[in-house]
Amino acid sequence: MEKLLETFKVLKQKNLSIDLTRGKPHSDQLDLSNNLMTQAVDPIGENGVDLRNYGEPIGIIEARKLGADILDSKIDLTIAGEQSSYLLMTQLLLGRFLFGLDDDPWKNDKEPAFLCAVPGFDRHFATLEGLGLKMHTVNLCSSGIDLDDLNKKLSKYPNIKGLICVPRHSNPSGEVFTDENIINLLKITKEYNSSFINLFDHAYLIHDFDETRVQTPIPLLADGLGALDLSLIHI
């Protein structure tokens, strides 16, 4: 401990000012899009909406088409909105907590809980904690969610509302879920509760650098199981 304190003291004396924000692009990266700011574009969208105005509640059609193409999802199941997937997930959780579906808000339940894949993303944990949702961990393995651990947690706790995870290049350890793992995850959680939600934070969907495991788009896997309602994917 003394050695650590001494190291900390030395670093503190350097008066460093370092931005450690994760995922924040460098100015050189931002410069790549400078020309987009000066292009003259038609402000009227393909469906007649004036893009300079408020837009559409579920997003402009062009953005939804792009998102559907990236996700291999149906466009009528794709929403484009907000500045980040994190904000969309927060709004979804808040809506379920306060209002629920069919007038069944989570806030009325006794100790509503959520499963968190670990190691995981601290912002996921902070959102759940802020809503007062009890968190239970579920381990990761080389193929994705540790299904044995998942079954143990679902058997032990009666009021789990959903699970949150990063299915591709999982934070911070990098797991890429196999198709079999995702399919079994959906089957298990669907059997546990038909209103269970799997929040797949697909922040790294297109961020492959080295050779990476092939992963069938989650909407296609979920559709084949009749589990689209259980799978909420954010990018």
Task: Mark where each language-model region is.
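Residue-level marker for buried hydrophobic side chains located in beta-strands
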Residues: 198-199
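N-terminal "arm"/small-domain region of PLP-dependent enzymes with the aminotransferase-like
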Residues: 1-72
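Walker B catalytic acidic pair
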Residues: 202
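Conserved core of the PLP fold type I
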Residues: 49-194, 205-228
